[in-house]
Design a protein with these regions (language model features):
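Accessory alpha-helical/coil subdomains and C-terminal extensions
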Residues: 7, 13, 35, 40-149, ...
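Start-of-repeat signature of ankyrin repeats
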Residues: 511, 564, 597, 629-633
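Conserved ankyrin/ankyrin-like repeat signature
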Residues: 526, 578-579, 611-612, 647-648
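Conserved hydrophobic site in ankyrin repeats
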Residues: 530-531, 583, 616, 652
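Ankyrin-repeat inter-repeat connecting loop/turn
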Residues: 556-557, 590, 623-624, 659
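Ankyrin-repeat boundary/linker signal
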Residues: 559-561, 593, 626-629
Length: 661
């Protein structure tokens, strides 16, 4: 779903990788602060004064005015620091490590490329938590896809020291990234992780599990050719990732490369030299970027749990991958399965088959009986394991768990994640391995229902219109005359006919209006009708309901055209608790902002709906952005303090505000 505010805030976590490397005598090497300096010098990535071509080419008149103003004249590097550019806001960023090149907690100055760079002051605010204010960069203003208003993306770059080649990434680094996101979760709208390509799919898979109850966009990206080269893919990859992160709420850990956004736990690196380096053979892309940015909303996961976001900070290192090969012996298998190994990803032949050697099967069975979790996936790039063959059934009988169509990277990181949870037994881990926790595998396809007949589709549309009439007239007090039409008169006219596409289009036009009307009336029956009619898609991928109506973010997040408010905004504003609970259970996004930059939590707190504030906070909502910066929250709290209204102050406190006496 598109975020609504004049500016979106994105934290870029720069871990290293080819994207920011330079050529040296030893080949490509990372260079500290090169990436930030380069992005700051390029107008498409940093246009604080809005004096670039990108900010002034929305119309011919705008371009001509800009061209004649003299602002289009190239500026020398000596004059690049203008008052307006140097006074850009800094953004408060937290990290699990000291921020800066020296690792000290005081301001530092060091020489870089014959220039002196002053590092921001870094403070240790708690055990293992450091805080600093980083200079921000801001993109040119651009039109939000699908809407008429414009937005800029303001971002800060949290650069690791040292920068890592992705081949040196370890499990502790995955946990560190997750911790950085958790520390900054309430301060930013989205997160972009810059990473080397070699192990990017391992990191994206791991983060998909470590980031529990995620409600914001997290995108990993990088490049095959560094930004320092004239011809590169770094510009498109980074700009595309920033554009998606700043304009859409896609609450998943994803990977963006070569104009495509993939689910992070569905990809593998397929080429070391193509710009199209990543493939997702068993799941379609979430976003395709061409002339238009096309989001495949029906495939985007929706958060339906009423829990706040948290980062899990432990992975079990006692896992490994074993690729079967013809002639493998039981001794080889036992060597892999020996302690301290607790989990094995077994890459099997074809659809889950293995050699029938008794010593190999005995090694697998003994390990499973001893508590080792073995997950079978296919060596094939595309496809899934199944029990159709006898050679696959023997593995299942030995205790091996089918892993469906998971990638090797996903299976390994999922196994490591589950084994790191002390509350889970080996049997529970085996059970969870075969279930889609983050959309990482395709569940068995249920039998398809019979195609609806023309009469069924007419009935569905009639039901929709009946609900619309009922809700529209529910507040009227005057009697409405009833018009009775006899059966003969009804039969005299032909029934309303039309194609399935026409009916779907009609429903798509009516459902958002009906949805908002039901929520405003606190009509849970009408709300449930809308959700069912829209074919609410669960995380398992099973579509329920009678119609397939595609609305960005799902019908549960449909926006009012005038105010940009979602149904959750309306329910929170009206104090309709039952609708709030139903919307959250159906995947409503708590971080959506309307045209004024407000969240549902802000409206609930402003209206004094304490119960709804508690419910939204428990679901992960937080105040931020324009609500704090424009002074809306501060003014409301100060007015309550001045009036001595402790009840109102308490509601804002429960919403996360710390009143100043």
């Amino acid at each position: 779903m598109e975020t609504r505010s004049d500016e979106a805030r994105v934290l870029v976590i720069y871990t290293g990788g080819t994207i920011g490397m330079l050529v040296s005598s030893r080949g490509y090497v990372p260079e500290p602060y090169f990436l930030t300096d380069t992005l700051r010098s390029q107008k498409r990535f940093h246009d604080p004064l809005q004096d670039s071509l990108f900010s002034n080419a929305a119309s011919v008149e705008g371009y001509r005015e800009w061209s004649n103003s003299g602002k289009s004249t190239p500026i020398s590097s000596d004059n690049v620091t203008t008052p307006g550019a140097s006074n850009q806001p800094t953004l408060l960023v937290r990290s699990s490590r000291p921020v800066g090149s020296t690792g000290t907690l005081s301001p530092s100055i060091f020489s870089h490329s014959q220039r002196v760079i002053e590092q921001p002051e870094c403070r240790n605010v708690a055990d293992g938590i450091y805080e600093t204010r980083l200079p921000s960069l801001v993109t040119p203003r651009s039109v939000v896809p699908g809407h008429g208003h414009t937005k800029r993306i303001r971002y800060a770059i949290l650069e690791w020291n040292p920068l890592l080649d992705s081949s040196n990434m370890e499990m502790d680094d995955w946990i560190r990234i997750a911790a950085e996101i958790e520390l900054n979760y309430t301060s930013f709208d989205a997160f972009v992780v810059l990473h080397g390509t070699d192990t990017m799919s391992y990191t994206s898979s791991a983060l998909s599990f470590l980031l529990e109850d995620l409600g914001k966009t997290v995108i990993l990206t990088g490049a095959q050719i560094p930004l320092s080269q004239l011809r590169n893919d770094a510009v498109d990859n980074l700009l595309g990732a920033l554009s998606i992160a700043g304009n859409y709420i896609i609450p998943e850990c994803s990977l963006y490369f070569n104009h495509t956004l993939y689910r992070g736990n569905r990809v593998s690196k397929a080429s070391s030299y193509d710009l199209n380096a990543f493939h997702s053979p068993n799941f379609p892309p979430l976003v395709n970027v061409g002339i238009d940015i096309v989001v495949n909303w029906n495939d985007v996961l929706r958060q339906t749990s009423l829990r706040r976001f948290r980062a899990h900070k432990e992975m079990s290192p006692h896992v490994a991958t074993l690729r079967l090969f013809p002639g493998m012996t039981g001794a080889t298998a036992r060597a892999f399965l020996a302690p301290p190994t607790r989990g094995i990803v077994l890459e099997t032949f074809g659809a889950g088959n293995a050699s029938q050697r008794p010593d190999v099967l005995a090694a697998f069975k003994d390990a499973c009986d001893g508590g080792v979790v073995i997950v079978a996936i296919s060596q094939c790039i595309k496809g899934s394991v199944s029990g159709d063959y006898e050679t696959g059934q023997t593995l299942i009988q030995a205790g091996v768990v089918p892993g469906g169509d998971m990638t090797p990277e996903c299976a390994l990181t999922k196994l490591s994640y589950l084994l790191a949870k002390p509350e889970l037994t080996a049997a529970e881990v085996r059970s969870l391995i075969g279930l889609p926790l983050r959309g990482e595998l395709t569940p068995p396809v249920p039998s398809l229902p019979a195609a609806p007949s023309s009469d069924d589709m007419n009935t569905d549309l009639s039901g929709l219109l009946s609900q619309l009439v009922r809700l529209s007239s529910s507040a009227r007090k005057t009697d409405i005359p009833q018009i009775v039409i006899g059966e003969e008169a009804q039969d005299a006219a032909a029934p309303w006919s039309g194609t399935a596409a026409e009916r779907a289009s009609t429903e798509a036009a009516l459902l958002p209006f009906l949805m908002h009307l039901a929520v405003a009336r606190d009509d849970v029956e009408g709300l449930e009708f809308c959700l069912t009619s829209a074919g609410t898609t669960s995380c398992s991928g099973v579509t329920e309901g009678t119609a397939e109506v595609v609305v960005p973010g799902g019908i549960v997040n449909c926006l009012d055209a005038g105010s940009g408010r979602s149904p959750l905004h309306v329910a929170a504003l009206k104090g309709n608790m039952r609708c709030v609970e139903k919307l959250l259970e159906s995947g409503a996004l708590v971080h959506l902002r309307d045209e004024l930059g407000h969240t549902a939590l802000y409206y609930a707190a402003r209206q004094g709906h304490a119960g709804i504030v508690d419910t939204l906070v428990s679901a992960g909502a937080n105040l931020g952005g324009m609500e704090n910066e424009a002074g809306y929250v501060g003014l409301a709290v100060q007015n309550a303090v001045n009036a001595g209204n402790e009840a109102v102050v308490e509601i804002w406190r429960r919403a996360g505000v710390k009143p100043v006496d």
